[in-house]
């Protein structure tokens, strides 16, 4: 069947298997990396034996390494054209070592060894960049069609949250399944069995690798730089592009704020349930699972919601919804009469997560827009560089999110071996789950108000680019 004129010019419509295949790449990364983000601090403090403050400093150091490493990867993938595909090749080339390092992060063979923790965590993070930066660039290489990108992003986030659900609900159950019964600290606690955590990460990482291979098999790059353009790509292009691409700067600062919020909130969720709400393992699984379930309801509706209220208003609405959920989570913990009402906690977590998922999920649809804007103004489509920049900023956000929980827990006197924490420690956990994330959401709302690329403007930009091709 012959291509339509629009398809010949890059405005491709993907079939559902291709959309699901692309989304499987994000689901795979969540099975691996979200497990790291959500549970590694808990593993380090409660199983591996690291002090929370020491772990916090390590998270910061690793993010500093990322600031150096990400632009190198971005320039490298833009400059080279592997036989397996310009961007998709790294799903395999980076996915295999990522899997190995992720598994080793949860091995307790060198319990308490800070050197081992650094080597495995730095290695995992560098390999994740080698997968994530090209994967992000792959999005903008599949099509220029803005409506298709919205559908593609919704599918991607649906799949990503399917992986997130498996992590948030499945990890507690899986760890308990593999636990040998001798490492439980109180009936409400997560098992502190190193073998159980290792086996759990082994299972999740291997499944994630399988989905990376599936993503590779279902994607085809259609909108990429030619050989002449790639020859001129260099690392310094990263900061040049950042300086002249205003929408990219706005999006970058939104990324750092959003990921800081998510990292703080995700890392503290297990502490909130275990020490503030004194939950059972089953209750913790439900709570963590509700962090992903709203995706299956709301992400398929994003194209219609965006069409109804507009891009910016959609951000405003769902960021506000998330803040409301955080307020309720705070009140449940501090009002004695509500502490036993776990159903209120579940509803609040669902509401908070619905807002966070839609707002932070749709932000990925803006990345191809800023790539196209850069191509429109300079004539160069450096998707890898742009995704390296967004990678730097979302990892900077994760750095803040990784440092803050450990430091706060240390400052308030958190004791991992105590099932009942002091009032100050409980208040510190509340700040991590509710107050700090809510303040970051307010900042994110202000930042996104400065984003200026409407759908109509993007249609004009993409048509202008194709007319020059």
Where would I find each of the regions flagged by the language model?
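Membrane-embedded alpha-helical bundles of multi-pass transporters/translocases
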Residues: 2-469
């Amino acid at each position: 069947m012959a291509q339509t004129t629009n398809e010949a010019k890059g405005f491709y419509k993907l079939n559902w298997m291709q959309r699901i295949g692309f989304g499987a790449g994000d689901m795979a990364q969540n099975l691996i990396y979200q497990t790291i983000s959500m549970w590694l601090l808990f593993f380090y403090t409660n199983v591996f034996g690291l002090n929370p403050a020491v772990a916090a400093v390590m998270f910061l150091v690793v993010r500093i390494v990322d600031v150096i490493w990400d632009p190198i990867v971005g320039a490298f993938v833009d400059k080279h054209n592997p036989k397996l595909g310009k961007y998709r090749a790294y799903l395999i080339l980076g996915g295999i070592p990522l899997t190995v390092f992720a598994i080793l992060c949860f091995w307790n063979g060198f319990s308490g060894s800070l050197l081992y923790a650094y080597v495995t965590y730095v290695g995992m993070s560098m390999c994740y960049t080698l997968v994530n930066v090209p994967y992000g660039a792959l999005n903008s290489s599949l099509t220029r069609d803005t409506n298709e990108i919205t559908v593609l992003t919704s599918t991607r986030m649906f799949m990503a949250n399917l992986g997130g659900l498996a992590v948030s609900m499945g990890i507690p159950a899986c760890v308990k399944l593999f636990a040998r019964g001798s490492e439980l600290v109180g009936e409400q606690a997560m098992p502190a069995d190193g073998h159980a955590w290792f086996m759990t990460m082994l299972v999740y990482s291997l499944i994630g690798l399988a989905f990376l291979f599936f993503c590779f098999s279902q994607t085809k790059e259609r909108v990429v730089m030619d050989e002449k353009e790639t020859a001129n790509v260099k690392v310094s292009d990263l900061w040049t592009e950042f300086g002249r691409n205003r929408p990219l700067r706005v999006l970058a600062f939104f990324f750092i704020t959003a990921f800081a919020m998510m990292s703080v909130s995700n890392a503290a969720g297990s502490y909130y349930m275990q020490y503030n709400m004194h939950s059972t393992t089953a209750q913790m699984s439900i709570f963590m699972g509700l962090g992903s379930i709203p995706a299956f309801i709301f992400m398929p509706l994003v194209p219609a919601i965006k069409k109804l209220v507009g891009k910016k208003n959609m951000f405003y609405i769902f960021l506000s919804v998330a803040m409301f959920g955080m307020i309720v989570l705070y009140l449940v913990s501090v009002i004695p009469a509500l502490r036993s009402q776990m159903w209120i906690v579940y509803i609040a977590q669902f509401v908070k997560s619905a807002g966070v998922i839609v707002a932070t999920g749709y932000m990925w649809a803006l990345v191809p827009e800023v790539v196209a804007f850069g191509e429109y103004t300079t004539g160069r489509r450096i998707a890898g560089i742009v995704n390296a920049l967004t990678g730097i900023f979302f990892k900077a956000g994760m750095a803040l999110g990784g440092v803050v929980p450990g430091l706060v827990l240390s400052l308030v006197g958190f004791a991992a071996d105590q099932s009942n924490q002091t009032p100050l420690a409980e208040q510190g956990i509340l700040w991590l789950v509710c107050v700090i994330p809510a303040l970051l959401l307010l900042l994110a709302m202000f930042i996104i108000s400065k984003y200026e690329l409407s759908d109509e403007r993007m249609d004009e930009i993409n048509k202008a680019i194709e007319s020059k091709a």
